[in-house]
Amino acid sequence: MSLDFVLVPGPLVRASSWEPTAQQLRKSGHNVQTPDVLDNQQSPPAWRAWTSHLLQCITPCHEPILVGHSSASPLVADLARRLPCRCIIIVDGEVPPSRGPASPIRPALFDFIRSIAASDGTLPIWSRWFAGDPRRTSLIGLDLLARDPPAFAEFERGLPSLSVDWFDDAIELADWDHVPAGLIQCSPIYDHAALEARRRGWPVVRLEGTHLHPTLEPVETTKALVSMSRDMIG
């Protein structure tokens, strides 16, 4: 049975980060969309408006599986109340609150980016946030991606330039946790999210990889997505 997937990237990257997994899913006979808000925007829209822009990028289909990577987890939770779906899968991201405000990043990370911003509030592109932290770079998988310089340069060219102020925003989530949801954890960065997902009774799959697993290990990511989807929807 073929499945319909909508793979949503976080605003810090582009849909190209999902493309290796999207291609693998298509090879396996599934239908896939990778909406990219920044394709049609000269500058990134506000976080609180991101879901509305996503909806404009999604071709109508019958109850897709919404998959959010990293900071896209609140986006798929918000999408679920506007777009009938079969289930939600979060890949290496936060577990959004059941309702109420959801910020693009955790408070500790917000404090960190304030420390690396230029005097006008401009931030480096996301791939350079942790340039001085080899361990974090390794957990994310940027060191692996950088082993292919042309591919890494192409990846970086697409990353948006954001300011600190952009992150001082929230999406107001309506009740969404009646929708079946699961978590695929790819890196130790989201150990806390896996604990919260289990507390809520979600299925959790642990892959031994990096944050950029959908980019770097598309075959394993695809298998996990398909298996979890079928387990949840029956």
Residue ranges of each PLM-predicted region?
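Conserved alpha/beta-hydrolase catalytic His-Asp/Glu region
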Residues: I125-A174
